Amino acid sequence: MAKGRVADRSPTEMLHSTPAGDRAVRTQGSAAPGSKDHLNEKPCAEAGSARTSLLILVSIFSCAAFVMFLVYKNFPQLSEEERVNMKVPRDMDDAKALGKVLSKYKDTFYVQVLVAYFATYIFLQTFAIPGSIFLSILSGFLYPFPLALFLVCLCSGLGASFCYMLSYLVGRPVVYKYLTEKAVKWSQQVERHREHLINYIIFLRITPFLPNWFINITSPVINVPLKVFFIGTFLGVAPPSFVAIKAGTTLHQLTTAGEAVSWSSVFILMVLALLSILPAIFQKQLKQKFE
């Protein structure tokens, strides 16, 4: 069984247990698993494909950027000032200016605005580009709370899943070369929580222990199933998004993104994070008791 096979491997072997990684492990020779030489062999094996991976990544990014260009071209005619404000927000002033433009056209061009928001959010998430936090806040300004929350969770889940697939396709050389030690440590945690992986992913999305971009690009390398990854992300981003969307209802009163988070909201997020991991803790204790 696959589970038994993973249990017999060293943490480093678990890191490389993708289909491509398994083929490479079988041809690695006499290096001892878990040794420094063993850790270095994989980057060497993947080095030849780094250039190909980069070309594929650039091609995919170019296609995605072209789609974003088409979405922008399909937008209603804008004034010169409005065109200047139609950009990915980098601070709260940008978010306010963009919100002002989108709210002006939202009622008349509802579908175009919704598609533009949806596509932009997924684009940022897919390529790990900063700015999605401001789009989360902006959703609370533009849409009713239930729709805004569903929209942000769906965009986050899809965007992170696209990033996952992109990493599976072309990102492994980067993980093997630059993130090996961190990925090995996380692979150990994943194996420890394998029976409750959805709860663990939810916990990680709520808490700031691991950056989202790191979770996205290393998950396919350490055998986190895509279905589990999507569900855990969709549910896990809901509590932080709740805070951001709620803040978006008072967008014009905010001056920085930090003002969207209060001590009460941090406390609530910590409680929800603990609740998400409790089933795994209780089941583990019951299992040990009956054994």
UniProtKB/Swiss-Prot annotation:
Disruption phenotype: Causes early embryonic lethality. Conditional deletion in the liver leads to decreased number of circulating lipoproteins. The modification Phosphoserine is found at S35. Residues 1-11 have a biased composition (Basic and acidic residues). GO terms for molecular function: phospholipid scramblase activity. The chain crosses the membrane at residues 52-72, 109-129, 147-169, 197-217, 225-245, 262-282. Pfam families: VTT_dom. It is a multi-pass membrane protein. The modification Phosphothreonine is found at T18. Its main location: endoplasmic reticulum. It catalyses: a 1,2-diacyl-sn-glycero-3-phospho-L-serine(in) = a 1,2-diacyl-sn-glycero-3-phospho-L-serine(out); cholesterol(in) = cholesterol(out); a 1,2-diacyl-sn-glycero-3-phosphocholine(in) = a 1,2-diacyl-sn-glycero-3-phosphocholine(out); a 1,2-diacyl-sn-glycero-3-phosphoethanolamine(in) = a 1,2-diacyl-sn-glycero-3-phosphoethanolamine(out). Expressed in brain, spinal cord, kidney and first lumbar dorsal root ganglia during postnatal development. Expressed in motor neurons and proprioceptive neurons. Residues 1-43 are annotated as: Disordered. Residues 140-251 are annotated as: VTT domain. GO terms for biological process: autophagosome assembly; intracellular lipid transport; modulation by host of viral RNA genome replication; nervous system development. The VTT domain was previously called the SNARE-assoc domain. As there is no evidence that this domain associates with SNARE proteins, it was renamed as VMP1, TMEM41, and TVP38 (VTT) domain. Interacts with VMP1. Interacts with COPA, COPB1, VDAC1 and ERLIN2. Interacts with ATG2A. Interacts with SURF4. PANTHER family: PTHR43220, TRANSMEMBRANE PROTEIN 41B. Phospholipid scramblase involved in lipid homeostasis and membrane dynamics processes. Has phospholipid scramblase activity toward cholesterol and phosphatidylserine, as well as phosphatidylethanolamine and phosphatidylcholine. Required for autophagosome formation: participates in early stages of autophagosome biogenesis at the endoplasmic reticulum (ER) membrane by reequilibrating the leaflets of the ER as lipids are extracted by ATG2 (ATG2A or ATG2B) to mediate autophagosome assembly. Belongs to the TMEM41 family. This is Transmembrane protein 41B. It comes from Mus musculus (Mouse). The gene is Tmem41b.
